[in-house]
């Protein structure tokens, strides 16, 4: 129990690591919080530093969700433990202790959390996400489709233990995308790499 609690706290710290800020400072000499959308995620890093660094940021943001949950599967056989570990990493990205409790939008980190425990369900949701991005041009809309469809897919496929996690993720992602949603409603959202999502 103590080990589980320590790992959940550690997962929050791992999730808090602002790779976008670190990479942009090291390789571009800039603070992404002051340029583009001001977001610390891969989408804004792509915008201000290029696709290569954006992809690297995306990889590490996914990894900081993936790694804690994988370790949790070795520490415990409880889906509740995986849920708490994953949420800790996601909340770390959203409210980083290294960025005065501010952060990114947590789409990439949420994907990382789900890969070890709901891979096929996530893959199907990602296909829907990609389709909507391709058809609409809005990365933010695709992200919202992904997190909205996931609880339904989990229910259909009988992965009931992770439905609560998926619903919490959906709520967090909608909250972190509230400005994007307002722009979508007003028809002011930017398309493709200019969108603020990941």
Swiss-Prot record:
The chain crosses the membrane at residues 2-22, 53-73, 79-99, 113-133, 152-172. Its EC number is 2.3.1.275. The keyword Transferase applies. Pfam families: G3P_acyltransf. GO terms for biological process: phospholipid biosynthetic process. It catalyses: an acyl phosphate + sn-glycerol 3-phosphate = a 1-acyl-sn-glycero-3-phosphate + phosphate. It is found in: Cell membrane. One of its GO terms (cellular component) is plasma membrane. One of its GO terms (molecular function) is acyl-phosphate glycerol-3-phosphate acyltransferase activity. Pathway: Lipid metabolism; phospholipid metabolism. It comes from the Bacteria. It is a multi-pass membrane protein. Keywords: Cell membrane, Lipid biosynthesis, Lipid metabolism, Membrane, Phospholipid biosynthesis, Phospholipid metabolism, Transferase, Transmembrane, Transmembrane helix. Belongs to the PlsY family. Catalyzes the transfer of an acyl group from acyl-phosphate (acyl-PO(4)) to glycerol-3-phosphate (G3P) to form lysophosphatidic acid (LPA). This enzyme utilizes acyl-phosphate as fatty acyl donor, but not acyl-CoA or acyl-ACP. Probably interacts with PlsX. This is Glycerol-3-phosphate acyltransferase. The gene is plsY.
């Amino acid at each position: 129990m103590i080990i589980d609690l320590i790992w959940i706290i550690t997962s929050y710290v791992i999730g808090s690591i602002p790779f976008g800020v670190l990479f942009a400072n090291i390789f571009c000499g800039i603070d992404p919080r002051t340029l583009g959308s001001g977001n610390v995620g891969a989408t804004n890093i792509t915008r201000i530093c290029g696709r290569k660094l954006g992809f690297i940021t995306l990889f590490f943001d996914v990894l900081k969700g993936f790694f804690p949950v994988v370790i949790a599967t070795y520490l415990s056989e409880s889906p509740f433990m995986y849920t708490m570990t994953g949420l800790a990493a996601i909340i770390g990205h959203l409210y980083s202790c290294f960025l005065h409790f501010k952060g990114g939008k947590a789409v990439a980190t949420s994907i990382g959390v789900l890969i070890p425990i709901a891979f096929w369900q996530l893959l199907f949701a990602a296909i829907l996400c990609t389709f909507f991005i391709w058809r609409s041009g809005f990365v933010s809309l695709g992200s919202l489709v992904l997190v909205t469809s996931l609880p339904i897919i989990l229910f259909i496929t009988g992965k009931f233990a992770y439905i609560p996690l998926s619903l919490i993720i959906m709520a967090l992602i909608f909250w972190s995308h509230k400005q994007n949603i307002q722009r979508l409603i007003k028809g002011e959202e930017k398309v493709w790499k200019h969108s603020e999502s990941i």
